[in-house]
């Protein structure tokens, strides 16, 4: 999904290539053109989906390269977290280019197994919001709702809903 997003959302009015770099630190993907108007690093997951190149997005969907248009970033986050990795890093992006960095990590096998078991039990993938909460709790062990919102850059209502679902599933314990 990250490779497809780079080609689908690049600014074709700008010169330059989509660049991929795999090194000891991880995978970096850079494409010409900053984020689409109204989208920033802080609202990538919650901004209204829009494509810079809607015809290309439709072609990629028709060809089977994407399941749903407008959900590429969600898929990138979910895939990275569910594989035991860290959050995708867009912090080096600018008005001239979007840069995605996926850090190389040794997957936490217990975490990956827990996610896989829960997804099999549900018969569906965990929502990206739940994966974000689980990842943050794996890293920090104990967080308040305010801290979860701060670390995730997500709205309180999304975090509350995700935590409630995770508590109900028995994956996390909540304090009152």
Region spans (language model):
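C-terminal regulatory or interaction extensions
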Residues: 1-176
């Amino acid at each position: 999904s990250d490779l497809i997003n780079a080609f689908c959302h690049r600014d074709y009015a700008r010169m330059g290539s989509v660049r991929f770099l795999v090194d000891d630190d991880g995978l970096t993907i850079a494409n010409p053109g900053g984020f689409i108007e109204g989208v920033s690093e802080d609202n990538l997951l919650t901004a209204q989906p829009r494509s810079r190149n809607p015809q290309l997005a439709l072609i990629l969907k028709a060809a089977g390269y994407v399941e749903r248009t407008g959900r590429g970033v969600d898929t990138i986050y979910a895939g990275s977290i569910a594989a035991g990795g860290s959050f995708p890093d867009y912090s080096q992006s600018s008005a001239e280019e979007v840069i995605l960095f996926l850090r190389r990590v040794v997957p936490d096998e217990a975490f990956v197994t827990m996610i896989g078991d829960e997804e099999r039990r549900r018969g569906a993938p965990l929502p990206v919001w739940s994966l974000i909460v689980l990842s943050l709790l794996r890293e920090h062990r104990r967080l308040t709702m305010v801290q979860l919102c701060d670390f995730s850059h997500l709205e309180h209502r999304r975090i509350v809903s995700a935590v409630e679902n995770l508590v109900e599933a028995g994956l996390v314990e909540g304090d009152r």
